Amino acid sequence: WVEPHAEGTTPMYEAMLRVRDMLSDWCSRSENRESFPPIVINITDGESSDCDDRELCDICSQIRRQSTADGNTLLLNIHISANNTIPSMVFPMAEELTVADHYARTLAECSSIMPDVFNSAICQMKGAGATPPFFGMGYNASIIELLSIINIGSRSVSNMQ
C-alpha cells in the first residue's frame, strides 16, 4: 500500500494523515465491509518533526477508529531509537513504560491496546509476570522480537482460537 521513504526528518503526522485517508477509503468500500480490519505497522524513530504529541495522538486515534464489521484497525508502532539506555520492550504493559523516554511513551499512547484475543500469545511470548493490557508497540526490539510483534499482530483471530 505504501512505499517506504527515508529522508532527513520524520514527517509522521503527514504519513499518518495519508494512512488514515487510505484506510477510510478502503474500509468504506462495500466489498471490504466484512473483511478482517486493516493492520498498520509504523516503523519510526519516534521523533515526529511535523506535529506536537497531541496532534500525533489525535491522528493515530482516527486511524485506530477506522473499521470493518470485524473490528477496528490495529495500529502497531515499532520505535527504533538511538537511546539504548532503556531496555527493549515488546507489547509493553503500562508499568514497563515508566522507564521509557518521552518519545516511547507518546508512541505507546498512539498504539492500539491489543485485543483480548491476542493476550494469551503475548503472555506466552513475554513470560512470567505478563498481564494485559498490552500496548501494540515495540521499543528497540531485536529482529527476533520484531518478527514476534509482526507475527502476533498480523495473525487472524481465527488462528488465535
Report residues per predicted region.
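Acidic, low-complexity intrinsically disordered regions
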Residues: 1-161
